[in-house]
A protein has these predicted regions:
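Transmembrane helices of ABC transporter permease
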Residues: 1-7, 58-65, 128-183, 254-269
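Alpha-helical segments in transporter systems
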Residues: 1-19, 54, 58, 73-77, ...
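Transmembrane helix-loop-helix hairpins at lipid-water interfaces of multipass membrane proteins
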Residues: 1-68, 148-153, 262-271
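Juxtamembrane helix-loop junctions of ABC transporter transmembrane domains
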Residues: 9-25, 52, 57-108, 112, ...
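Helix-loop junctions and hydrophobic alpha-helical segments within the transmembrane domains
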Residues: 91, 95, 204, 308, ...
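An intracellular "coupling" helix at the cytosolic face of ABC transporter transmembrane type-1 domains
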Residues: 97-101, 117-126, 130, 134, ...
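Helix-loop-helix
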Residues: 146-160, 173, 230-307, 311-312
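ABC-type nucleotide-binding domain
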Residues: 329-489
Length: 489
């Protein structure tokens, strides 16, 4: 509504501008203004009053256009931001349901790019399209109709200009279209290399391979730079082309229009109408330019949308049963049984573990010993269904784990990863990890994990800050805090 009214008002404005010019060109009595009284006398005179009234109407229209622009921008931003927020939430929820197979398929760096850069691209496009897709067609069609009404023969100049501009814009559009997908893939690669370099910074320094890592980043950087320069250089023709077409159109209208004014009796064209025709021609060309910009943005937005939909449309391999079993924690014994379990990774030729059978009895400790790559970690990852067994079954208290609800299964497991993973926040936050645990429970968990001593050596004890990834504590301390978190669960 705001956009439609704004478009109509902007189309009305040139009419009043031409009317103001017509009134100003009329012969008037020579008048001097020596004070405010003379100004009011001038305002009330029959010669000058139409000029003041027309100028006043123009001022009111401009104020309304400004108000409507502010309101429309507010709602556009609100809709675009809400869209991006919901999309991020849906993508995050979907990623949470992925098994490690799906995580390996997409890679963490690619998922980060999709949930940040790609959604940001779509947000910007939605914001842009809301502001221009509805307004500019109204402006373009309205300006062309008004130009034809003023003088149909001179409007042919506008038609030729619009067709020429459209051909140029489509040519540029076709040239740069394939490069948008390449840019997004390079963004994934850039995130991957940067993430590897930053997370492995200590290893890089210890091996004195800074130059080697810099060369890897520079290679991706150079590819990105080349594509950005090409796209920027090609798209850079748009605005100069627009300026050229606008200038030539105005020149042609003025040239042919002046000839028509010389024969006013035949054509009925006057200077005000010539100005009006020039104004509407400029508005039509500008509107076409903005409409084309929308279509030029489509490929980049389409690439981002496809990448996001690839995440949202992927069906997780590991699913919950339609009527899952919910076990009560207090009634669970905790017996885990593997019956002839075989597992191989997605797209792998060989199985990592084959025909494994054992029973981990409740209340007893079961340990796995084997060489590197023998499948110890893989076997453990099958219990919380980070992966699903290719063959055989795994049971908890004689119930197959694929029959259990995810909430029930996860509530039974205290998981401590090989590499201690901590989150930004305090030590207390990391041990409690979303649970409303009291101080005594948190401290008891830390004590059992043999982490109480080093925690209490910190100035703020349990309120000490942990940086992202736990980089401000040692590897052993991270492991103790991870164990405490699992115990507290």
């Amino acid at each position: 509504f705001f956009i439609t009214v704004r478009g109509i008002l902007e189309l009305l404005l040139p009419n009043y501008m031409a009317k103001l010019l017509g009134e100003a060109m009329k012969d008037k009595t020579e008048t001097s203004i020596n004070g405010i009284g003379d100004f009011f006398k001038l305002f009330n005179s029959s010669e000058w009053q139409p000029i003041f009234i027309t100028a006043g109407i123009m001022l009111v229209i401009i104020i309304f256009i400004i108000i409507l622009t502010i309101l429309s921008r507010y709602f556009e931003s609100k809709v675009a931001s809400g869209f991006a927020m919901e999309l991020r939430r849906e993508v995050y929820k979907k990623v949470e349901s992925f098994s490690l197979d799906e995580m390996d398929y997409f890679t963490v760096s690619s998922l980060i790019t999709r949930t940040t850069n790609d959604i940001q691209q779509l947000q910007g496009y939605v914001n842009f399209i809301l502001g221009f897709l509805f307004l500019q067609p109204i402006m373009a069609i309205g300006a062309i109709v008004m130009a034809i009404r003023i003088n149909a023969s001179l409007s042919l100049v506008l038609t030729v200009s619009l067709v020429s501009l459209l051909i140029i814009l489509i040519t540029i559009f076709v040239i740069i279209l394939p490069y948008f997908a390449k840019m997004q893939k390079l963004m994934d690669k850039m995130n991957l290399v940067t993430r590897e370099n930053l997370t492995g910074l200590r290893v890089v320094r210890a091996h004195n391979t800074q130059k080697y890592q810099e060369e890897k980043i520079d290679k991706v950087n150079l590819e990105t730079k080349k594509i950005n320069i090409f796209v920027g250089r090609t798209a850079g023709f748009l605005w100069p082309t627009l300026g050229l077409v606008l200038g030539l159109t105005s020149l042609a209208i003025m040239f042919f229009g002046a000839n028509h004014i010389n024969f006013e009796a035949r054509t009925g064209l006057n200077p005000e109408e010539l100005l009006l025709l020039q104004q509407y021609s400029s508005r039509a060309i500008m509107s076409l330019m903005f409409i084309t910009m929308i279509f030029i943005m489509i490929p980049r937005a389409n690439v981002s949308a496809n990448r996001i939909m690839e995440v949202l449309d992927l069906e997780p391999r590991i699913k919950e049963e339609s009527n899952p079993v919910n076990l009560e924690f207090e009634k669970v014994r905790g017996e885990v049984v593997f019956n002839d379990v075989t597992f191989k990774y997605m797209d792998a030729d060989e199985a990592v573990i084959k025909n494994i059978s054992f029973k981990a009895e409740a209340g007893k400790t079961t340990a796995f010993i084997g060489s590197t790559g023998s499948g110890k970690s893989t076997l453990i990852n099958l219990i919380p269904r980070f992966y699903d067994a290719t063959e055989g079954e795994i049971l908890i208290d004689n119930i197959p784990i694929n029959k259990l609800s995810f909430n029930s299964l996860y509530s039974l497991i205290g998981y401590v990863p090989q590499q201690g993973i901590l989150f930004s926040g305090t030590i207390r936050d990391n041990i409690a990890f979303g649970k409303n645990s009291n101080v005594e429970t948190i401290e008891k968990s830390a004590e059992i994990a043999q982490g109480k001593e080093f925690i209490e050596s910190f100035n703020d004890k349990y309120d000490s800050n942990i940086s992202q990834g736990g980089t401000n504590v040692s590897g052993g301390q991270r492991q103790r805090l991870s164990i405490a978190r699992a115990i507290n669960k």
